[in-house]
Amino acid sequence: MKIIENQGKQITTRQAESLLFRDFRRPLIEIMTDLRKPIQPRFIKHKTIKGRKINFVSWYELNRLMDFYAPGFEWNINTSFDGTKVCVIGALTIKAQEGDFTRSATGNENSDLDAYGDPYSNAEAQAFRRSCARWGLGLHLWG
């Protein structure tokens, strides 16, 4: 492990790389151009709901793509429950050279449905996918 000096403090090369990437910000127009590109087919999954074939990308794959195109992005949620339905409002913030920019979306799930996962994580995943689409990521799948 190599030790280097940064602002009078000794840190490892791994810590230096972390600082470099944490402070890295791209121009917003470049980020948005990349996010609007169609997602590669290897990330796209398929499921059938009520007889219709649906194309989708898992939230964790979208998370990886966001890490690649918009390093340092932030995801914040607020949840509510009315007794039968969970609602999540998610805010996806991109850190660009020009500043921080946020777009929000909602996700919801009935609490009594027998679905994979739990209502809260399903609603959050839906809000995240929708927030990504508001930035252009995966938007071509919604049409």
Residues of each region from the PLM?
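Positively charged, aromatic-enriched nucleic acid-contacting surfaces
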Residues: 50, 57-143
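N-terminal, Lys/Arg- and Ser/Thr-rich interaction peptides
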Residues: 1-54
